Swiss-Prot record:
Signal peptide: none annotated. It comes from Thermus thermophilus (strain ATCC BAA-163 / DSM 7039 / HB27). Pfam families: PMSR. Keywords: Oxidoreductase, Plasmid. This is Peptide methionine sulfoxide reductase MsrA. The gene is msrA. Belongs to the MsrA Met sulfoxide reductase family. It catalyses: L-methionyl-[protein] + [thioredoxin]-disulfide + H2O = L-methionyl-(S)-S-oxide-[protein] + [thioredoxin]-dithiol; [thioredoxin]-disulfide + L-methionine + H2O = L-methionine (S)-S-oxide + [thioredoxin]-dithiol.
Length: 176
């Protein structure tokens, strides 16, 4: 089965990147900026909230090992899908959650997973389902941020607890 790409915005890309690196079947995770109207934005530009980009990750995965539907179920567990412009302590349109679909099949699967999970939340799902347009990889200093800075306050207080929750809830999807 050929590899696939998923582009997902779930708040801070340091968190999302670290979370997806735990999964078997994931071949690569690249943090960056999805959507938007400014070509090749910088982190500083995206942080102004005026470029239209979301912090996101591109996940290259083997759907024979990790089906897209399971990847999306995991995605919904590692971000707050009911919050429009906030994920934990991070506030602004650049943290707005979204699934950027790369094909009609990805769109169909995402719609089905969203319908399946909607009753589990006390509020409507705010995560947007959008066609993929652009993705710009983040600057090198953002890549593998959690792995390189596990003792940084944000990593200890925000990312580590999120990863622990994911490890407990999704043992069957994790790398050995």
């Amino acid at each position: 089965m050929p590899e696939e790409i998923a582009t997902l915005a779930g708040g801070c890309f340091w968190c999302t990147e670290a979370a997806f690196k735990l999964l078997r079947g994931v071949l690569e995770v690249v943090p960056g900026y999805a959507g938007g109207h400014v070509p090749h934005p910088t982190y500083e530009e995206v942080c102004t909230g005026t470029t239209g980009h979301r912090e996101a990750v591109q996940v290259r995965f083997d759907p024979g090992v990790l089906p897209y539907a399971d990847l999306l179920r995991y995605f919904f567990a590692v971000h707050d899908p009911t919050s429009e412009d906030r994920q934990g302590p991070d506030v602004g349109p650049q943290y707005s959650p979204a699934i950027f679909y790369h094909s009609e099949e990805q769109k169909r699967v995402a719609e089905a997973v969203m319908r399946e999970l909607a009753p589990l939340y006390p509020k409507p799902i705010a995560t947007k389902l959008l066609p993929f347009t652009t993705f710009y990889p983040a600057e090198a200093y953002h890549r593998d941020y959690f792995a390189r800075h596990p003792e940084a306050p944000y990593c200890r207080l925000v990312i580590a607890p999120k990863l622990e929750k994911a490890r407990k809830a999704f043992k069957s999807l994790l790398r050995p």
